[in-house]
């Protein structure tokens, strides 16, 4: 049975998916680079987010490793040259954060448009500056 290490915090759904597909999963999220290097030889797969750095030293120590999955868009925390040299496939999820990014962008735009940050700051100081809090209304306008 293939064995995967999840070394960064992920939803428990990830574990369920692996287990439904007869893949043994260990989730160890507090590993130091040295700790990861010591145990990586026991795994066929490694799942990371951005905290774990899959360096050449770690990848080279992973004699059974076949794949590194990055739960996120970038792969800057994975040594791609080392992965290629060691015949390790690297995959990511480039569209996984699209909705969250769009929602965050719209939230920031609305915050700017309605002066929410300034209003919050003033309220915490005990001020109630109605003119600053008013902001602008969207009715009849296009935003974005």
Identify the function of each model-found stretch.
Residues 1-91:
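An N-terminal-biased, well-structured beta-alpha scaffold segment characteristic
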Residues 69, 142-144:
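Residue in the alpha/beta-hydrolase core beta-strand immediately N-terminal to the catalytic nucleophile
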Residues 86, 94-142:
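Phosphate-binding beta-alpha-beta segment of Rossmann-like dinucleotide-binding domains, i.e.
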């Amino acid at each position: 049975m293939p064995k995967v290490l999840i070394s960064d915090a992920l939803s428990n759904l990830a574990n369920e998916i692996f287990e439904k597909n007869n893949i043994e999963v260990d989730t160890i999220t507090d590993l130091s680079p040295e700790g990861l290097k010591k145990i990586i030889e026991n795994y066929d797969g490694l799942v990371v987010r951005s905290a774990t750095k899959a360096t050449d030293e770690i990848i080279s120590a992973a004699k059974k490793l076949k794949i590194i999955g990055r739960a996120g868009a970038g792969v800057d925390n994975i040594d791609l040259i080392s992965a290629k040299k060691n015949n390790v496939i690297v995959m990511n999820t480039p569209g996984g954060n699209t909705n969250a990014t769009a929602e965050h962008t719209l939230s920031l735009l609305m915050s700017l448009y309605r002066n929410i940050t300034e209003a919050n700051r003033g309220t915490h100081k005990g001020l109630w500056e109605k003119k600053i809090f008013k902001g602008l209304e969207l009715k009849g306008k296009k935003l974005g």
